[in-house]
Amino acid sequence: MVNIPKARKTHCVKCNKHTPHKVTQYKAGKPSLFAQGKRRYDRKQSGFGGQTKPVFHKKAKTTKKIVLRMECSCGYKKQQVLKRCKRFELGGEKKSKNEAIKM
């Protein structure tokens, strides 16, 4: 499991110095209904004839790459890719070394 703090001090390209950044997880936006491919697909699908293009079934990956979105105090935003992981946590409790396991 990957646990990342909600704030991180890192370099800002705009300020050109190390500043505190607010960390969030990137989420993809809603796909546009007016993109050329979507318009073409909808036009082809309309009317009689069923499914016109193959539906993708051969899914290979079980995880997605984690993308962090960091915002500087000046407002500049940058993104950083982490490795693949099954479980990701933002600002969770930090593990301590000499603590007994709680049941």
UniProtKB/Swiss-Prot annotation:
GO CC annotation: what is one? cytosolic large ribosomal subunit
* Gene3D superfamilies (UniProt xref): 3.10.450.80
Q: Which InterPro entries match?
A: Ribosomal_eL44, Ribosomal_LSU_eL42, Ribosomal_zn-bd
Q: Does the keyword Ribonucleoprotein apply?
A: yes
What top-level branch of life does the organism fall under?
Eukaryota
Output one GO BP term: translation
A Pfam family annotated for this UniProt entry: Ribosomal_L44
- Tell me the segments the record calls region Disordered: 37-56
Q: Which molecular function GO terms apply here?
A: structural constituent of ribosome
Q: What is this protein called?
A: Large ribosomal subunit protein eL42
> Which source organism?
Dictyostelium discoideum (Social amoeba)
Record lineage = Eukaryota, Amoebozoa, Evosea, Eumycetozoa, Dictyostelia
Q: Which gene encodes it?
A: rpl36a
